[in-house]
Design a protein with these regions (language model features):
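Alpha-helical transmembrane segments
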Residues: 2-171
Length: 171
């Protein structure tokens, strides 16, 4: 990436951290999506013998335990501290493994969540009050369209799993 490495790193980290934070709006959404991404990083790190398997594996284990209490109806919530830490984990792991552009693939849900907010705010200001989505981030739009909370989480998790498979094929 040359001289673009620093600005790309900056936007990738900020975007990923905020993307995970925006995703943390439904019971189990951020934790289930990030669990799938963490499994992807664990599988890839084992294949690459990168040495970070204990870290990625610990995050997988931690998220599995956390999800027991975070799925609908949630008894425990991660809050900003948890979601920002998970975003930092995803961005940091991608960079340590020298695959920062893979964040766009495996973190597609994070990207969509951030873009939905940016698009909504920009359009709202440009049109003096009109909206593209019923609500942003987009997981709330789907809720207002009649999807249950568990359906949104399931669909977003399946999309993440498919994108992780695509990323594995791209290696």
């Amino acid at each position: 990436l040359g001289w673009l490495a620093v600005p790309v790193l900056f936007f990738a980290v900020i975007g990923t951290v905020n993307g995970v934070n925006f995703t943390d709006g439904l019971d189990g959404l951020a934790s289930s999506v990030t669990l799938i991404v963490a499994v992807f990083f664990t599988v890839v790190s084992i294949g690459m013998k990168s040495g970070i398997e204990p870290i990625t594996g610990a995050v997988v284990g931690g998220l599995m335990g956390f999800l027991l209490f975070n799925v609908y109806p949630a008894k425990v919530f991660m809050g900003d501290t948890g979601s920002l830490a998970l975003g930092g984990f995803v961005a940091g792991t991608a960079y340590v493994m020298q695959m920062p552009l893979f964040i766009l693939i495996v973190g597609l849900i994070y990207l969509i969540e951030v873009l939905s907010v940016i698009i909504q705010v920009t359009y709202f200001k440009a049109t003096h009050g009109k909206r593209i989505f019923k609500m942003a981030p987009i997981h709330h739009h789907f809720e207002l369209c009649g999807w249950s909370e568990t359906r949104v989480v399931a669909v977003f998790s399946v999309i993440t799993a498919v994108m992780c498979m695509v990323a594995l094929l791209a290696l």
